[in-house]
Amino acid sequence: MSQSISLKGSTRTVTEFFEYSINSILYQRGVYPAEDFVTVKKYDLTLLKTHDDELKDYIRKILLQVHRWLLGGKCNQLVLCIVDKDEGEVVERWSFNVQHISGNSNGQDDVVDLNTTQSQIRALIRQITSSVTFLPELTKEGGYTFTVLAYTDADAKVPLEWADSNSKEIPDGEVVQFKTFSTNDHKVGAQVSYKY
């Protein structure tokens, strides 16, 4: 018998995916030094996760709020921008689109089991990890930082720590679309745009 995921479980799955994706991108792109990361097992993969307390807390605060918005159906996109510290210019824009699926339990064909979801997440994380093979090298060691944008509904409650921002698009950037994954309540797609 397959295990399906509830709304809370689906939201937790999506939020957890964001956590591992952010960590993976920050490591793979050299935004933080390799020694700030440790290996962990997740999704039957060996992944990297920061052990830097300040960075962990920052990511945790972001994802706690994103989790609340997802649970309420208020967040439809999460964006991680890698920014050149000197120029203030966005050099990569990692976009995760979230589609909220409602009323999906009317037939057995619509149920997404946990194993399928995890397999799709594995494929997506592998694509993110392998992106270093085609993305331009970020050459300024220690010269990059990141920011996270959340696209929410107009009526979403926004904490004071969050501020409105422009979309931080990369004009005339190259765009690479990645795979998607689905739960019973969410469909998540990813893409990266970058300066070439």
Curated annotation (Swiss-Prot):
Matches recorded under InterPro entries? HORMA_dom, HORMA_dom_sf, Mad2-like
Coiled-coil boundaries:
none
Keyword Cell division included in the entry's annotation: yes
Per the record, what is one GO cellular component?
Answer: nucleoplasm
Gene Ontology biological process terms in this record: cell division; mitotic DNA integrity checkpoint signaling; mitotic spindle assembly checkpoint signaling; positive regulation of protein autoubiquitination
Main location group:
nucleus
Q: Which domain of life is it from?
A: Eukaryota
Gene3D superfamilies xref list = HORMA domain (3.30.900.10)
What assembly does the database describe for this protein?
Component of the mitotic checkpoint complex (MCC) which consists of MAD2, MAD3, BUB3 and CDC20, and of the MAD2-CDC20 subcomplex, both of which appear to be assembled during mitoisis independently of the kinetochore. In mitose-arrested cells, MAD2-CDC20 occurs in a larger amount than MCC. Interacts with CDC20 and BUB3.
Query: Which family is annotated?
Result: Belongs to the MAD2 family.
Q: Where is the HORMA domain?
A: 8-192
Q: What else is known?
A: Present with 1110 molecules/cell in log phase SD medium.
Key words, A-Z:
Cell cycle, Cell division, Mitosis, Nucleus
Q: Where in the cell is it found?
A: Nucleus
In Swiss-Prot or TrEMBL terms, this protein is called: Mitotic spindle checkpoint component MAD2
Per the entry, what this protein does is: Central component of the spindle assembly checkpoint which is a feedback control that prevents cells with incompletely assembled spindles from leaving mitosis. Thought to be recruited to unattached kinetochores by MAD1. During checkpoint activity, MAD2 is relayed from the MAD1-MAD2 complex to the mitotic checkpoint complex (MCC). MCC and presumably the MAD2-CDC20 subcomplex inhibit the ubiquitin ligase activity of the anaphase promoting complex/cyclosome (APC/C) by preventing its activation by CDC20.
Task: Specify whether Cell cycle is a keyword of the entry.
Answer: yes
